[in-house]
Amino acid sequence: MILQSTSLFCKYINNCRYINREIVATLKASPQGLARIKQARSDRGWSVDDFRWLELASEILGVCWQENGVLAAGISEGTWKRFLAGKQAINAEAFKAYCQVLGLNWEEVQEGGRTKERKDTGTSRQEKFLSSSHPHTDWGEAPDVSIFYGRSEELDTVKRWVTQENCRLITLLGMGGIGKTTLSVKLAQEIINSEKIYLSQSPEYIIWRSLRNAPPVEDILAELIQFLSGQQETNLSNHLQGRISLLLKNLRSSRCLIILDNAESILQAGDRNGRYRAGCEGYGQFLQCIAETSHQSCLILTSREKPQGLAKYEGDSLPVRSLPLTGLQEQEGRELFNVKGKFAASCDQWQVLISRYGGNPLALKIVASSIRDFFDGDVSQFLEVSQQGTFIFDDIRDLLDQQFQRLTTLEREIMYWLAINREPVTLAELQADFVANIPPRELLESLSSLQRRSLIEKSAGGFTQQPVVMEYVSNHLIEQVCEEMREWGLVRSRGAEEQRSRGEKIHTQYKLNAALPLTALSTPLFTTHALIKAQAKDYVRESQISLILQPLINQLITEFGSLENISNCLVHILSRLRGKSPQETGYAGGNVLNLLHHAQVDLSGYDFSGLTVWQAYLQGVNLHDVDFANSDLSCCVFTETLGNILSAAFSPEGQLLATCDTDCHVRVWEVKSGKLLLICRGHSNWVRFVVFSPDGEILASCGADENVKLWSVRDGVCIKTLTGHEHEVFSVAFHPDGETLASASGDKTIKLWDIQDGTCLQTLTGHTDWVRCVAFSPDGNTLASSAADHTIKLWDVSQGKCLRTLKSHTGWVRSVAFSADGQTLASGSGDRTIKIWNYHTGECLKTYIGHTNSVYSIAYSPDSKILVSGSGDRTIKLWDCQTHICIKTLHGHTNEVCSVAFSPDGQTLACVSLDQSVRLWNCRTGQCLKAWYGNTDWALPVAFSPDRQILASGSNDKTVKLWDWQTGKYISSLEGHTDFIYGIAFSPDSQTLASASTDSSVRLWNISTGQCFQILLEHTDWVYAVVFHPQGKIIATGSADCTVKLWNISTGQCLKTLSEHSDKILGMAWSPDGQLLASASADQSVRLWDCCTGRCVGILRGHSNRVYSAIFSPNGEIIATCSTDQTVKIWDWQQGKCLKTLTGHTNWVFDIAFSPDGKILASASHDQTVRIWDVNTGKCHHICIGHTHLVSSVAFSPDGEVVASGSQDQTVRIWNVKTGECLQILRAKRLYEGMNITGVTGLTKATIFTLQALGALR
């Protein structure tokens, strides 16, 4: 918020009126001044019709501003536009106010004006402040300080420390409201603008960040590293010290100025020793390294207390220093008062007033409002009253106490909500927070009152509070809720004896208060305010938890003695809520549920039936047997059943987001609330791509079932299914007129379809490999297609002719996108690059390098200025299309990023990943706004121990589960992997289990202890398969990095790397004698390796798609393979001849297994079946039906009597080989197992379907 300080202007106006009668009443900008006005407006990103100038100008002129758009007296939209046009002179007062709004000196921009050196007012370079004009600045949420008073001595001191004396760490200390933040921003601005600082002394990078919401130190370090490395560091260490070391590397190589504001937020409240808040201890390690390690950069902290451990590094001649800030001087304080209006006081009275409040700028602003509103600007009257002791001031909190006591009930409620929201909120958002319906007029009046008192601020984003005010109100909220809970049945602790007997006293108090009606406690904040908002932006909700909810729990523990007592109290509150109306109970039910969860109470079996439960955040929370029958669950957030998500698209108006995944579903979400609105079911295999029609009425999807489907966005009904492709369909795109749809397929063709009747209009041929993506040009005349043949083809849509083939990539071209202005085409490739093309000429204009893995998806922003890319390296990069540099790298996904999409307004980015999450990002700040997470316990690989005792299953929940398969009893889980587990194998002696994961590691586990004793880390991509050598001393692993590795399990040493496959290795098997190893690959081949020499001694080719598994028969004479071409093949591997092809599956075949005698073969398929085959005849004996999702694996028991199968329906099934009957179903408890949602309200049908899939009952 702009520091409101305009006394020079006010003095000038008064002097003009009463002294200098000859002053000109109108002013006009000179041509040079007009250019500066336009530049200043452009730097702020304001359009001519932007109304943010209105509020600021109103404040400066001292007239009332209104939210509803009514212009204040003397200020009109026409005057503002005439000022910007510069053709006519306008009212002098308005001219000066408008200049001040833009941070300009009116004397220098007026016609016939003068230019002079200025000290603290706007400078020629100040206009560009908070813009992107400096090539290496990132201001984050830094406030505008274009209006600034005094502090010249402090500025000079700190500037000297930074630029001349090479200080590494500087702490600006002072009480809340003293001006630390403003000084830090002004300092950075002056360093940029100063012509007296030599280039060698000036920082090359300046970054400003606020710690107000206590972000994890790892997140702050990631932001700093990305910025200082020019977005080149993508592989950040998961360890704190690794990130610190990487940051120090950048601080040594370049001169950097880092400013971290509000550092008191990471310190324990009320602790003058500067100890760190729980969870923020890593900041101490970070600051220690900055202080004691040699580098050429400077970190500036602003804080109310000095962080612990820094004092020992400080000294007048040492590179670590601190500067305590005191209040403003008298003259500076008087100028601040002038912003608020007219005040009458003698020099002595001014001195007394400013001295009494220590020159604290925030305190003076608040007091000025009181004097203006209650004493008509008469300082002497105020001083007379204050001498009676009603305005005692030792700390800013004292002043806020006095102000808070004088607020109306509605004003207090607004203050609480602004503290909870943590960032600016609009009037509509604030109104929606209230349980009661507050008329907009009353809300506006209260907001206006609070704004006049300087208790709240208004920015372009809405209403908020200064950090010191927000902290005060948050603490007040916590104290008030604690008091309310005591009134509801708890007693205050009074010494050790009472602490010991608290349980009995609590019980007694329950009896005493049991008869009290809920309304007897007035209107508790516990019911009127949500302690956290489940649907808030992710980073806001995390700060609500760490700064409101968790401190409240800590205080309750102090009050009540134990978590059990807290739990008892909350249960008692629930009983008092039941039977009351939503208006009476408000947010209490949701608050109880959130408190119980974050107090780590096991919620199993809790009764929330018949209650209003709003704003409960329940993603990832076990709710086994919880009763929500007949409850109102509005605004609650639950876990989703998302698979690996492959694509995302915004609707044309930006209100909806569609996603599709490997669960064969298309989902439609409401962006603002995060609600799941629709689940479109109909595809029979992975859904690869989704896109909205230009009018937003139709959703098109395509997938591995070779179909394209059209859905009604209104109700999720499938309108048409377009058939004709003979392979997976990877991409679809609507023509701009919405009448034609293009589809790209693995059958190497593109088809154009008529949307109305579903007929295929044209089939475009020319690519020699899978066509991965299609996109129409903005004018609809050209279609671009990209393929696995490394090329891009441009087609004339009307004639179906190939106009041009673009060749430059060296890998699959996975994505293409036209810029909105139609000037360029971008392409993303498996060669890890992005290329920008002039598609009219075929010239490659630029190649973007930075990703360390395949680029899967790209998208232009609506204004064509930014290109976004998503990659297999798990990052999202934003590229400036004018400078062609990476301006931001977004981290957070833990697996490959498959799809990226800009919202229509260009402000939000949607990204989806194989980590089963959808994330929305703020494009400007890089903050994650919202994330939807899937929770599915897929059973991926299964394996019997050779001793028949245990069945193991690997899951996408990152664990290996051990089962007593004969009884169906779950034994335990092996935890340690950080991603999906795709391969498991037992050692021949059953003592060791190996697991392979998409976290690129292989782990070896001791089955008896459940401990991991070896981690193998040399693969550079997902590890799909692991197998033990028959002698048990060596394992082989296969990876998406296209290599097979052989390992010594005792030492963890990699013995050999076999690397002749051209695509990922999906399956492996040893020959019974251990001499050969077979590897199955997505390159459609099986290779046979001599394990002693590492040479490839044979290749089996015959499948027409990815080969998922290859296994030797027990006698070693034949090999069986399976593929996504829906077949199983039997081979004479010595001759390289296919003996049989087993057909019958109607979808991909993922896994096969021989019975111990080699006579039977089992196969697992995406068609949800297991088939039992006679190896000799090739006939199918049994089709085992029961799974409700794809079957990913099969394994025979050592005695060959049963087969186990693992499925994405989250079950393992045991089948009788002779009969095909299902004998046993093994399933771990799902997240919401047994949760009763009978009669619930506030949830969409899609969400209810999801809850049922996770175990809920209805």
Curated annotation (Swiss-Prot):
Gene3D superfamilies: P-loop containing nucleotide triphosphate hydrolases, YVTN repeat-like/Quinoprotein amine dehydrogenase
Basic and acidic residues composition bias: residue spans: 112-128
Intervals holding WD repeats: 55-93, 640-679, 682-721, 724-763, 766-807, 809-849, 850-889, 892-931, 934-975, 976-1017, 1019-1059, 1060-1101, 1103-1143, 1144-1183, 1186-1227
PROSITE patterns: WD_REPEATS_1 (PS00678), WD_REPEATS_2 (PS50082), WD_REPEATS_REGION (PS50294)
Pfam families: Beta-prop_WDR3_1st, NB-ARC, WD40
Region annotation Disordered: where it falls in the sequence: 112-138
InterPro entries: Cro/C1-type_HTH (IPR001387), G-protein_beta_WD-40_rep (IPR020472), NB-ARC (IPR002182), P-loop_NTPase (IPR027417), WD40/YVTN_repeat-like_dom_sf (IPR015943), WD40_repeat_CS (IPR019775), WD40_repeat_dom_sf (IPR036322), WD40_rpt (IPR001680)
Keywords in alphabetical order: Repeat, WD repeat
Gene Ontology MF terms: ADP binding
Alphabetical list of SMART domains matching this protein: WD40 (SM00320)
Claim: Repeat is one of the keywords in the record: yes
PANTHER family the record matches: WD REPEAT DOMAIN 5B, WD40 REPEAT PROTEIN
Name the UniProt record assigns to this protein: Uncharacterized WD repeat-containing protein alr2800
Organism, as annotated: Nostoc sp. (strain PCC 7120 / SAG 25.82 / UTEX 2576)
